């Protein structure tokens, strides 16, 4: 008897739940389907005049020009691909150092030959005694002329020598058998600083070749 009551209650509950479920599905299916259409409004809506006040730039057409238009593919210009970054290889750098060494060696060989050729092509002119002394002094000054390269500047002489030796060890091939010296220079306010100099070099071309090799290796260099 009790079992029959429970079965009847369960059946009634099941019928009610089924009715609610199917009623909800029917309600959902009876709703209209929402369809989204393209917006036909202009890109820019021009505001109206408020209290006889004209809004600035109300007639600007910049937004209208942004509207996508049909583009002819034949009129499109394609930009070239960007350049690829340079790849720096240590092997290429060593080869460049060797080429610099060869260039400096060639310059050192060509320079004396040119000087000797120029001396032989000079016309012989007889000079007075006083003129001979002036020419002799000028020639001695020219022979004693030398060039140095500036590697940097610091505040003390000891620091200058230390930094110069460090740079010399860093570039043993370029600064081989070079004497590091310092030069005291005065500021406008009375203070002093010291230049780090390497040399002497017998010709300007030789000093320039050394500076080019140092600059290639990212070391500051100035001819003095």
Swiss-Prot record:
Domain SPOR: 141-224
InterPro entries: SPOR-like_dom, SPOR-like_sf
Topology with respect to the bilayer: Single-pass membrane protein
GO molecular function, one term: peptidoglycan binding
Keywords, comma-separated and alphabetical: Membrane, Transmembrane, Transmembrane helix
Coiled coil: none
Principal location: membrane
Cell location: Membrane
Any one annotated GO CC term: membrane
Name of the featured protein: Uncharacterized protein RC0096
Source organism of the structure: Rickettsia conorii (strain ATCC VR-613 / Malish 7)
